[in-house]
Amino acid sequence: MKIRHLCAHALVLLTLCVLSPAQNGVDVSKLTARPTVNWARDGVIYEIYPRAFSARGDLNGVTDRFDDLKKLGVNILWLMPINPIGEKNKKGSVGSPYAVRDYYGINPAYGTKADLKRLVKEAHARGMKVITDQVLNHTAWDNKLIKQHPEFYKHDVKGNITYPENWTDVAWLDYSNPKLRTYMIEMLAYWMKEFDLDGFRFDVAHKPPTDFWEQARAALEKVKPDVFWLAEGDRADEEVKAMDADYSWDLHNALTAVWQGKKPATAIRESWQKQHDAWPKGALHMRFSDNHDERRAIARFGEPGALAAQALMFTLDGIPLVYNGMEVGDTTESGAPALFENLKIFWPIAEKRPDFPRFYQRMIALRKSSEALRRGDVEWVSNTNDVCIISFERHATTDDALVVINSCNRAEKAHLETAVEGFHDVTPDIAKENAAPSGETASADLSVQAWGFRVYRRAGSGQAGSE
């Protein structure tokens, strides 16, 4: 489900999506975010839609490609919902994966519980973690809870079970009911214990109350403590005790506006700063240019524009996301209504876009090799071209990084207002199969090609990341 749509048309709704620092009288910006396991903090998330991922469209079709994903370099595999899909009021020909008919079941089109156990085992054998999408805000209309526990749902003034927003294919759950909370916590514990999962991604996590998430996290810490919880939302208070990371929708919207020429490059910095100042210290955000709610970045920005956008996601602080197919330049429709159909990723397109797999492999490898790019503090660098050029440094104990990205579809020049001594160019050369970075010494005066990007590194200044 998509939060951005909730904010698109009204400033009032925007405040629901990007809250002020004050939460229930507490300024959460003065607090510290809960600690996150190292494998997640240093990781790269790979979102998988099993229906679209392979020709067979099931869990085994995912597992069979694990060697490819290991080679790509991702380490957190996020499976979009694998539960049976509701038939009543369904959207499209196959329905939304976010309309869950059975919280304890696996979509028969995806396989069996044994298939999921095999998937997790094979992922762990390759050093990859597995998280599953959990939809706790609403259910399908033919979920058994509708009849067994109608009191679990929100009702309108006439006593009818209602739905959230304009999502007519789902029924809205009511977390003022303590028995619903218990049901959901027990359900999550089942998936963790039965399948050895490494965490969850929670759909529209901003709608259930924060105190439920805190209650659930406290209970599930006793089941498996070293896990990763990702919230589809951007509500600051959730990262104090419950969630490990959330979405950065405001930054994503700023990126779209900048890349489409509707805002200057400075909008990226302004959005980042706004969230940084309002969230708990050390809060993590997932960084994305593409996901299942969007038209493909390559369709919105073109080939070089999509790579430049993802270069920003790989080098800015937070945890970068790769949505399946991005790494080959797939253009298959992914958001609604395509989400409700049986559309496959066109993997052979990689042969015509070899720069895409090279970019993804090499940028992920670069991020892995650099403490600064994984964990370093962000220091924004002023430059003389505020319209097109984004520039910032990342500082860590072992190394520093300098990143320069041209957000415009024309070559641009800029002077960087920072000391560049000691920085050397490590930008992956994606034009050639076995090309190495140039290693050239950085200059404060740069000319950057259309949608171009540069990454420089130098030995660490001794500044440990404060966040």
Where are these regions (language model features)?
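Carbohydrate-interacting/catalytic domains
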Residues: L19-W78, P84, K117, E122, ...
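Active-site-proximal helices and loops of the catalytic beta/alpha 8
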Residues: N24-S29, A33, K193, D203-H285, ...
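Active-site groove signature of glycoside hydrolases
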Residues: T182-T210, R287-N291
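Short, solvent-exposed turn/loop segments enriched in Gly/Ser/Thr/Pro and often Arg
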Residues: W78-G92, D133-D142, D203-P209, E232-D237, ...
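Substrate-binding/active-site clefts of carbohydrate-active enzymes
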Residues: G25-Y46, P50-N75, P81-F195, Q215-K224
